[in-house]
């Protein structure tokens, strides 16, 4: 779908909600001890080293692990984001000595940028390149290393603190806005839940464990259903008609709405997209 951006007031739980996502996502299969979270069978999601092993008929050991949630700090350097090549080692030992960056760790996971509207322009450009191609290329002194960087981009921020660059905003498939709760009873409920968690975190987690497991199972079922979800031609035309009337630039709006509607239908355990899903 292309990630999600959550904008809203300070102290409304944006970061807390986003960081909790990994607890409800099913585990993924990755190649053991691989810094890029390589997929064991999909060539578009594996490093060159793993691909060569598979092409040579070697077996690769795999493990199940939680989906990675990688934070991209606002002041991060280009080397920290993209990774670095040890030139001295490469020249003296003849090996590609690569120290993976945040993009490598985020492959097949979630890359989270808090206060995304304050991100430096040079980091925005790096994100745009990786988000568009799904690959990260690092070149130093004639040495080039390329690895998969297919991640879900998630951003949050307060719109009052600055505007988001249109090019980056265009990379987020979905947008959510959070406002401060005004209803006194609901505010009390939130404060009480927070107090109870602070007193006994383990007990609070245990209380919601069953509900969370059901939620996780619902996502697993939806993932299996998704490839077979059908979207009627007339509804596809309606989506494009609405996007046209809203003067949406390009075709990303059409594509995202089609994909999101299918995902929502799968989440609701349906085989066909309805108007309500759209």
Predicted regions and their residues:
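Conserved ASCE/P-loop NTPase catalytic core
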Residues: 1-185
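Conserved hydrophobic residue
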Residues: 2, 136, 196, 271-273
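Alpha-helical scaffold segments in soluble metabolic enzymes
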Residues: 16, 20, 80, 126, ...
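Generic secondary-structure signature for well-ordered alpha-helical cores
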Residues: 26, 132, 177, 196, ...
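Conserved AAA+ ATPase core "coupling" helix
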Residues: 80-82, 164-222
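P-loop NTPase catalytic core
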Residues: 160-161, 165-167, 181-189, 217, ...
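C-terminal helical "lid" subdomain and adjoining coupling/linker elements of P-loop NTPases
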Residues: 228-229, 234, 239-278
